[in-house]
Amino acid sequence: MLNQTSYHGAGAIEEIVNEAKAHAFQKAFVCSDPDLIKFGVTGKVTGLLDKEGLAYEIYSDIKANPTIDNVKNGVAAFKASGADYIIAIGGGSSMDTSKAIGIIIANPEFEDVRSLEGVAPTKKPCVPIIAVPTTAGTAAEVTINYVITDVERKRKFVCVDPHDMPIIAVVDPEMMSSMPKGLTASTGMDALTHAIEGYTTKAAWEMTDMFHLKAIEIISKSLRGAVANTKEGREGMALGQYIAGMGFSNVGLGIAHSMAHTLGAVYDTPHGVACAMMLPIVMEYNADCTGEKYREIARAMGVEGVDQMDQAAYRKAAVDAVRKLSEDVGIPSKLEALKEEDLPFLAESAHADACAPGNPKDASIEDLTELFRKLM
């Protein structure tokens, strides 16, 4: 599944007003987080709307890990606004909140977002969304997934719904240039995790393999430059993360994401950081169920001489390349907040996560406990 239309490259946001007019939209519900508004990123889009006299209302009650209340408040605000479409500006938090709001508005029988967990049984398409990513990582602009945090129960839940695909994606690297180094690094590693998990998931097949390998190659070449805020790095990451999204949205992910969701819910660990920590650990665990795929991962990441390596060597080379990239962009390999007494809850939550069944190697609660322990 893909967007009806997508625009890529510097200046792509100029197309937003053209699309709004072409669809005869009357008023935009602009979802964006407070920091993007504060630092003028959201204003790059609303300024275009102002120039053309297009009506909009801004909703900014969005946390980094969006909550049930963020969605509930957003639904009420949308109803009061008189808007007929959504412009989602931001990273995964803004995108996921927008998808949940749009789905509930179109399918009011699912007023409680928790009822949408798993493969959602909605019948109507989401309110039209124009998605404008400001991070290069989540690829939420081209996926059918969204993740919401249940603060009370200390868990994240994944909703999968073909009806929530944004109709238009506007991937403009200039909207990502203000990302600080840490956020660039973590969202970039999230994108790499999407590509590698999508490539190795049980549902992977030839067409998605093509997307994922190309994404691994582009991300591996671009992330260090993006962290240094080079034009080439930003452009590469904008494209690479989108291609990864084209792949994994159709085949799912694995336990690196299941475990990252749990760490985010319990410790509020940034999602990309949690993915970066878990990815090499999970790759080691999965290695014996991946055939020759790690050879291709290593090759895509620029490792030389992979054709001369035996299976153990190229599998190690792939994991080492991931660890080196994560280290180079400044992401820690250990989680100081992790406590031994939390391990049972963490493992049970990860085991129940919607991403877990796609992992190439089945993982028991005991297996997940030991994998979490490697972060200590």
Show which residues each predicted segment covers:
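Short glycine/serine/threonine-rich phosphate/pyrophosphate-binding segments
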Residues: 13-16, 38-41, 68-71, 94-98, ...
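C-terminal charged capping/lid subdomain of soluble metabolic enzymes
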Residues: 294, 298, 304-376
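ATP/NTP phosphate-donor binding region
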Residues: 1-85, 335
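Glycine-rich phosphate/pyrophosphate-binding beta-alpha loops
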Residues: 137, 242-275, 353-358
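Glycine/threonine-rich beta-strand-loop-alpha-helix active-site module
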Residues: 69-174
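Carboxylate- and glycine-rich phosphate/diphosphate-binding segment that chelates Mg2+/Mn2+
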Residues: 145-251, 366
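Catalytic phosphate/nucleotide-handling subdomain of diverse soluble enzymes
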Residues: 262-301, 376
